[in-house]
Amino acid sequence: MQPIRMLSSSLSSQISAGEVIERPSSVIKELLENSIDAQAKNIDISVERSGLNSITVKDDGFGIEKDQLLLAISRHATSKINRLSDLDNINTFGFRGEALASIRAVSRMKLISCSQNSNIAWSIYSEGFSNHTLLQPIAHPIGTSIIVDNLFYNIPVRLKFIKNERSEFLKIDETIKKIALSNFGINIFFKKDKKLFVSYKAITKNNNKIHRLKTVFNQIDLNYVLEIKEKMHNITLFGWLIFPSSLSSTFKKIQYCYVNNRFVYNNLIKSAVFNSFYEIIGNKRSTSFILYLTLPSNEIDINIHPTKNEIKFHKSNIIYFFVYQSILSSLKKCKIKYISNNFFLKTHSNKCKNNNSDSLNTKLVSQIHSKYEKKDLYKDVISTDLFKINSQRFLKEYFFSFGKLLIVFQKYYGLMYYSNTFSLISFPLAKKIVEQYKLRSAIKNNMIPEIFSYNFLYFITFKQNKILSNNLKLLLKFGFNLILKEKYFFLKTIPIFLKNQNLDVLLSSFFSFIFFKKKIYIKDIIKWFDTTILIEKNSWNYEDGISILLEIEYFCPSIFKKPPLKLLQKINVDEVLCILKV
């Protein structure tokens, strides 16, 4: 352990101001983080009157030397950093040297510690802002104990913001839960008013971490927990997706993000999670999760917020796409069946059946299936870009994977990798093919196209009126709802897949086509849309690419067995290697 030093004025000026102690849970958080930084294996926490009377945190870490006790409770004194460059590579919870000084300023605090190099423990006592301290020897095992009494005794205005003891206790309990879920190898014992409230036993094996999860949140059914474990170069993502045991909105959501074992509030990670789930179930906030992201410490900036609960990623786009694709990939491995990018069913492999942490229970599948079958819940459960599903025949029994999207190239193409082969895929053509398959699948399965209102007035002749009259039922089947008068017709709705087209031009062309054909059939309309619909998108990003590839996996995975030349082109790596070798 490095000795505690006073930070230079130039270094302390570069550090974001530390957290103001606002409530007992703030004290608990700071003291627990200090114990973890001291490599403690056992931590005892005790509170009286929800921490307002007394807070005690005792650990068996490496302790503090006698001559450093006064420094330990001084402002801007720390063993974690000593130069400006250290701020770019922080591997500890604390680094500002302000925690104990801030706690000392608003309480009567006693610090007792025995270092690994000493046979005698020493204590130091301080009250509020007073510079008077009392140092004396005392019996204590190796480690540190901090007793915080009469919190805010000298700042009574702070007490006015304390709602009640119960709410403060719940905040303390939440703080301890967050620490327990990121430090599996530590025994944590929590006492409330001298009675053991909860204990979290240390987890020594990685595959037993889920038991800590169950201890922390005992309402969780492990049959509804899906484990996430992905890696990309020096970045790893581990954690759990937690589904409610019933699809009830009353299930308490748990949304915890950890970066390098530090609990953080990070909208980037949450956005990646929500958007990946939106691809599956059509609801961004319908699941709970606990995720642990690990990456080199020099890739993040912790020194931006007093609580250190907010961080900044230096390469945020990479982090976003890694988390986004990792969750989709994990769902694939458990054979998630994509249904129009909005909901999922699941079939279990033998591995899934034998490992609760890797899979969802079949009960969840049956509940989802049951909800899917209820007509009155279609709109809530399945909302597609194109159709309202009303036929179970739409569910397919295969799940196909054709490779991994690496990067987006020149805004329109994606670099794919599969089975030692690199290929370029055209996103615009892929999107058009998917729309064609959707349309054919809908008509084949008697699906009702989803529509949207669009006012279109078209003047017609007597002959054209007769043609439309003969084709009204077929047009309605495709979502064209029109009011036919003697000399004109008024179009009220059109199918939603036409929404992004140049409608005035397209509709005029469409009805001219009908007047020319006179009698039209389903295949005529499908063929016309196949050749006429344009995919008007100026550029594609990585997320767009993932979305269209997911649609291909569901609607038309067989297209990659013999792909059109303009859809997919393999890159001849051997030719390139020959050139490079020369």
Swiss-Prot record:
Report one GO cellular component: mismatch repair complex
Keyword DNA damage among UniProt keywords: yes
- UniProt record, GO biological process: mismatch repair
User: Which Pfam families does this UniProt record tie to the protein?
Assistant: DNA_mis_repair, HATPase_c_3
* The keyword DNA damage is annotated on this UniProt entry: yes
Keywords of this entry: DNA damage, DNA repair
**A GO term for molecular function:** ATP-dependent DNA damage sensor activity
* Alphabetized SMART domains for the sequence: DNA_mis_repair
Q: What does this protein do?
A: This protein is involved in the repair of mismatches in DNA. It is required for dam-dependent methyl-directed DNA mismatch repair. May act as a 'molecular matchmaker', a protein that promotes the formation of a stable complex between two or more DNA-binding proteins in an ATP-dependent manner without itself being part of a final effector complex.
- What does the sequence similarity comment in the record state about its family? Belongs to the DNA mismatch repair MutL/HexB family.
Give the HAMAP family listed for this entry: DNA_mis_repair (MF_00149)
NCBIfam families from the UniProt entry: mutl
Under which name does UniProt file this protein? Answer: DNA mismatch repair protein MutL
Species per Swiss-Prot/TrEMBL record: Buchnera aphidicola subsp. Schizaphis graminum (strain Sg)
Taxonomy of the source species: Bacteria, Pseudomonadati, Pseudomonadota, Gammaproteobacteria, Enterobacterales
| Gene behind the chain | mutL
